[in-house]
Amino acid sequence: RPKKCIFVENLIDNAMYIRKIDKLLLDWKNYEDRKPLVVRGCRQCGKTSTVISFAKKHYKNVIYLDFHKEKELCTIFSGSLNVDYLVVLISAAIPSARFEEGKTCLIFDEIQECPHARASLKFFKLDGRYDVICTGSLLGINGYSTIDSDAFIPVGFESAINMYPMDFEEWLWANGIQDSVIDILKHHLEEETPVPQAIHNSMRQLLLQYIVVGGMPDAVKTFLATHDINRVLTVQRNIIEGYKADMVKYANPTDKNRIRECFESIPRQLSKENKKFSYSVVRKGARSRDYIGSLQWIEDAGMIHRCYNLNITELPLSGNAIQDSFKVFMADTGLFISLLDEGTQFDILHGKLYGYKGAIYENIVADILGKMGRKLYYFHKTDGIEIDFVFRYKGECTPLECKARTGNAKSLNTLLRHPEKYHVNNAIKVGDYNVGRAGSVLTIPLYMGFLLTAL
């Protein structure tokens, strides 16, 4: 019989952070005809602690099964998936488990490790007495497994939501910034008026720290407890090593080296003047057909955001994307900075974001937009026009330029002078300055990027 599960209280960090996914979890629970829920995301983005904390707040009984640490638990699901039968086996394995209709939540952690448990979600849905929340790494959930897990996916009997590392707004909450301060920022964005200098300086400093620390909860926790960047860097590098361990665990043997080469090329890709992803930077003479699957693997792991070039700046953006022309950004700014040269953190904390040919600026914008769940696009033409990002904002196709220093944006001006050709009427520049407007161009400080949510 499986040994007793770790008691659930031991898995919750006392210093829990407010996460935006909490609202999605509550919306799910309040939906009468809810299905078992799968929370998927990259490794160590806070899935387990968030789900356990939520369940303990909203259910009388929480039953936790970790299929990664206690693989014997999978034997519970190796036979009949009848819910009454499973209740008997789970109760035997976990004597503290209590099953009460409408008051019990089962948490299946690392569900990709036990495909039969995932298959049981259909039966829990049809039974309807107990809620089930699962967590899963993107790799396993997307079918990268040593076993044929696709056959066990209960199509139509589960819901899924994505979870990301902490974004800048969650970082502000973790640092004790109240919503009243964020409301002030929103007001100045809407009115297009400068943020008061004291708030501006504070937000700017918090952003510099966020660029270095990023949103991985362990890195955030370490920084807030110690303010020791070297300790934060150790945490970040351990997370990176965990990703590399996943490459060994999940990837086909023939792909492992190629995946690692693709991943390790990202800083070199972004430090180029032209940041379009080039397979020859991965390895001299490399061809796209040899590496395209490896890059997809990294994307499916939640480690990167792909940013596609556009044929034309016109909605819908997805219909105008060039599939074989793209940039690759790290999904979390802190992990990206941890891959750069020693001392980069020191430079950033002192306001020096100009290095790597603008890569730090572009990657933080990719971090901000990507953690909103947005797809990323840019615009680059052979005639010299290049726009860092293009996104839908307030119903319009909107170019977004990120500038480390103030200056004329020639490409932006070209687009705005020819709306009949480029379908652009307004643009946004983010950089190290306050809110302002010059004609059709709204300038905002980089720390305000998280407020650009309007579709």
Label for each model-derived stretch:
Residues 143-271:
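Interdomain motor-coupling "hinge/lid" segment immediately C-terminal to the ATP-binding subdomain
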Residues 107, 131-137, 162, 171:
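Structural recognition of the conserved hydrophobic beta-strand(s) that form the central parallel beta-sheet
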Residues 221-394:
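Accessory nucleic acid-recognition modules appended to NTPase machines
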Residues 70-102:
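Short glycine-rich substrate-engagement loop in P-loop NTPases that contacts/grips substrate
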Residues 3-30:
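N-terminal pre-Walker A segment at the start of P-loop NTPase domains
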Residues 50, 54:
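Hydrophobic positions on the alpha1 helix immediately C-terminal to the Walker A/P-loop
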Residues 31, 391-399:
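Active-site beta-strand-loop-beta-strand hairpin of nuclease catalytic cores
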Residues 47:
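Conserved lysine of the Walker
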